[in-house]
A protein has these predicted regions:
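Long, low-hydrophobicity, solvent-exposed regions enriched in small/turn-prone and acidic residues
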Residues: 1-146
């Protein structure tokens, strides 16, 4: 199960939004409760619309894991104390480019540095992402308006 508390965004200055959040997540990996992961977490996020073409953001999330992590590799928490920051440049009303960086706050390593081109295709969104740290490409198509 999962629960989160937050609030309406605070507006510290023009075109900026800031919010705190905190929550608790509990995952059961066996029907008899044999493997349980408890994870309280908290964080803060700020985003700023600089102008019509540029958005910036930054945030911090801390996941306080107990002694038991997920038994499944796809469900592991990679960065328990994580800084995220980046920005989006809106090239046209249908095209934008974003840089998103995820940094491990414990050791300072940049774990992800993703450059994404997004195109609005009316009923679909197309995303082409270059993951610079992993040196891989990812393409994603998302249906909308259905």
């Amino acid at each position: 199960y999962y629960g989160e508390l937050s609030h309406d965004a605070l507006k510290p200055w023009t075109n900026a939004n800031f919010r705190f959040f905190g929550g608790y997540q509990r995952d059961f990996y066996k029907a008899d409760g044999g493997v349980v992961r408890s994870m309280p977490y908290w964080g803060a996020r700020i985003n700023q619309k600089v102008n019509n073409r540029l958005d910036l953001w930054a945030g911090y999330t801390q996941r306080n894991l107990g002694s038991t992590h997920s038994p499944y590799p796809f469900d592991e928490v990679e960065i328990p104390k994580e800084l995220t920051y980046g920005g989006t440049v809106h090239l046209t009303d249908k095209d934008d480019v974003s840089l998103n960086i995820r940094q491990n706050a414990e050791n300072g390593n940049i774990e992800y540095k993703n450059l994404t081109y997004h195109r609005d295709l009316h009923s679909f969104d197309a995303y082409f992402t270059y993951k610079a740290v992993q040196k891989t490409w990812e393409m994603k198509w998302t249906a909308k308006d259905f």
